[in-house]
């Protein structure tokens, strides 16, 4: 009998502190109108001093586990995507495991920048399909605010903090229909966060996110268009078969371009970038959780998730919820 994975539960967490565009305009030369026109972002959530990637992940994970009616001790695997880990090592997944009081399963991190959740979901799906796991917790969690240069208007306007999670469980019919992941390291210098501990990258200036925005935008739009075609073709589906697009929340113009490629009206696209900014690997599970909980996404509907980020790394997941 074939084995598949399905999403059994979702969860999400956003910090209480909110920074608006007007707040940023008091610090750098910008305005609410300028930011909204170029990005679609109006506000973003910022982690408190005592919040970390693992603490936010715990809240989102407990919500997802409760929604799935699964005890943490019944998990076979924890996969956590982040570019802002609590520590270089051990993995933030291990720290989350400790917070959940679990000892019996493996736990590890995935680092694929803004595409991290898709990469983690793909790995989890493979574990379940191969019969090596029955229940997997997949998390995206980020504290981007601690890697942002708050005096650089090109990046400080973009990023927010938060965590999202899903529980995957084995099923006899496809939930996850396919996943597709790709990377091309030749673009590494267009979007990156240096490691201060690495040789030659230890200056104070290099401890913040660096991005060549216009170049990233061009590649992202073209690349996401191609992965939409790849995903539909592999599954023998037409654009009209997709009920919902849940994209990485980087920029409303990129999101709109992908929706246009799918011939989807924006009413069938889950958009959170206006209220949350770019939460990197957390953005897709946060958006998915919101749309599930408010009733927009219903059981049996077909959902396309897609993401693009530093590396470059990009990917998609097609699923029947």
From Swiss-Prot:
PANTHER family documented for this protein: 3-OXOACYL-[ACYL-CARRIER-PROTEIN] SYNTHASE, BETA-KETOACYL-[ACYL-CARRIER-PROTEIN] SYNTHASE III, CHLOROPLASTIC
Gene Ontology BP, a term: fatty acid biosynthetic process
Record's protein name: Beta-ketoacyl-[acyl-carrier-protein] synthase III
UniProt source species: Methylococcus capsulatus (strain ATCC 33009 / NCIMB 11132 / Bath)
Keyword Transferase listed: yes
Assembly and interaction partners: Homodimer.
Pfam families tied to this protein: ACP_syn_III, ACP_syn_III_C
Gene that this sequence comes from: fabH
Family from the record: Belongs to the thiolase-like superfamily. FabH family.
Keyword field contains Lipid metabolism: yes
EC nos: 2.3.1.180
Catalyses which reaction(s): malonyl-[ACP] + acetyl-CoA + H(+) = 3-oxobutanoyl-[ACP] + CO2 + CoA
């Amino acid at each position: 009998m074939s084995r598949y994975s399905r999403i059994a539960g979702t969860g999400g967490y956003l910090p209480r502190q909110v920074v608006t565009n007007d707040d940023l305009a008091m610090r750098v030369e910008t305005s609410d109108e300028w930011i909204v026109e170029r990005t679609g972002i109006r506000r973003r959530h910022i982690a408190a001093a005592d919040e970390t990637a693992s603490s936010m992940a715990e809240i989102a994970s407990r919500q997802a586990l409760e929604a799935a009616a699964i005890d943490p001790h019944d998990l076979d695997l924890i996969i956590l995507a982040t570019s802002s880990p609590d520590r270089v090592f051990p993995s933030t997944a291990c720290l989350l495991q400790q917070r959940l009081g679990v000892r019996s399963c493996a736990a590890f991190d995935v680092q694929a920048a803004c595409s991290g959740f898709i990469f983690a979901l793909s790995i989890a799906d493979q574990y379940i399909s191969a019969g090596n796991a029955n229940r997997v917790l997949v998390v995206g969690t980020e504290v981007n605010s601690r890697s942002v240069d708050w005096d650089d208007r090109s990046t400080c306007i973009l990023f927010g903090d938060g965590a999202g999670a899903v529980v995957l469980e084995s099923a006899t019919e496809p939930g996850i229909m396919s996943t597709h992941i790709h990377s091309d390291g030749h673009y590494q210098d267009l979007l990156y966060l240096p490691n201060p501990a690495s040789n030659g990258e230890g200056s104070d200036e290099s401890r913040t996110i660096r991005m060549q925005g216009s170049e990233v935008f061009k590649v992202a739009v073209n690349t996401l268009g191609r992965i939409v075609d790849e995903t539909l073709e592999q599954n023998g589906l037409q654009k009209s078969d997709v009920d919902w697009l849940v994209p990485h929340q980087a920029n409303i113009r990129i999101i709109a371009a992908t929706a246009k490629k799918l011939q989807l009206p924006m009413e069938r696209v889950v958009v959170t970038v206006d209220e949350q900014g770019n939460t990197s690997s957390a953005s897709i599970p946060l958006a998915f959780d919101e749309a599930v909980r408010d009733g927009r996404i219903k059981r049996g509907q077909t959902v396309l998730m897609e993401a693009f980020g530093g590396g470059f790394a990009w990917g998609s997941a097609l699923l029947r919820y």
